[in-house]
From Swiss-Prot:
Residues 65-66, 174-206 are cytoplasmic. PANTHER family: ARGININE EXPORTER PROTEIN ARGO, THREONINE EFFLUX PROTEIN. It is a multi-pass membrane protein. This is Threonine efflux protein. It comes from Salmonella typhimurium (strain LT2 / SGSC1412 / ATCC 700720). The gene is rhtC. GO terms for biological process: amino acid transport. It holds the Pfam family LysE. One of its GO terms (molecular function) is amino acid transmembrane transporter activity. It comes from the Bacteria. The lineage of its organism: Bacteria, Pseudomonadati, Pseudomonadota, Gammaproteobacteria, Enterobacterales. Keywords: Cell inner membrane, Cell membrane, Membrane, Transmembrane, Transmembrane helix, Transport.
């Protein structure tokens, strides 16, 4: 059982460390707003991972195989949401360019909205859908007991929370924030283009 937990932990940390919508959302929120806002987003992402992990432990890959239409809806819906997020970031970058001398406009000042945006970002994340629907399911076969499944669920949850807490803390450092102030419009524009790209890729690859 320890080997199973170790393998899952290693696979999951690699999945977390590969840049994707979750990473860019947390880092952009931390550097442009605050660590508190980023941590609310981290909690939202962690709750999203809990949903995916729970469904995967109940047999997500079997559901997707038998209900192809559901897979299409998830992919298209997630892609549209990521495209919308990309559009919002690109629009914000253009506003910064038009009013460079003024203070940056903070669109999501309320912590509750950062939590919700983090949750929706993860639930619409193509990497999460593919990972939990295929790779993750390989480790939770019928021979894995209830205790081990609960252990894996807890491991995935804590690992996700720990990793994105580190990301939020690093990008909220004063040095990182000063760098963002100088390059705000370019960073937001780049992040927006990435989100839109993720969304378009998700829609056309369904």
């Amino acid at each position: 059982m320890m080997m199973l937990f170790f393998t899952v932990a290693m696979v999951h940390i690699v999945a977390l460390m590969s840049p994707g919508p979750d990473f860019f959302f947390v880092s952009q929120t931390a550097v442009s707003r605050s660590r508190k806002e980023a941590m609310m987003g981290v909690l939202g992402i962690t709750c999203g991972v809990m949903v995916w992990a729970g469904v995967a432990l109940l047999g997500l890959h079997l559901i997707i195989e038998k209900m192809a239409w559901l897979h299409t809806i998830i992919m298209v819906g997630g892609g549209l949401y990521l495209c919308w997020m990309g559009y919002q970031m690109l629009r914000g970058a253009l506003k910064k360019q038009d009013a460079a001398a003024s203070s940056p406009h903070i669109e999501l000042a309320q912590s509750g909205r950062s939590f919700l945006k983090g949750l929706l970002t993860n639930l619409s994340n193509p990497k999460a859908i593919i990972y939990f629907g295929s790779v993750f399911s390989l480790f939770v076969g019928d021979n894995v007991g209830a205790a081990a499944r609960w252990g894996i669920f807890a491991l995935i949850t804590l690992e996700t929370l720990a990793w994105f807490t580190v990301v939020a803390s690093l990008f909220a450092l004063p040095k990182m924030r000063r760098g963002y102030q100088r390059l705000a419009k370019w960073i937001d524009g780049f992040a927006g283009a990435l989100f839109a790209g993720f969304g378009i890729h998700l829609i056309i690859s369904r």
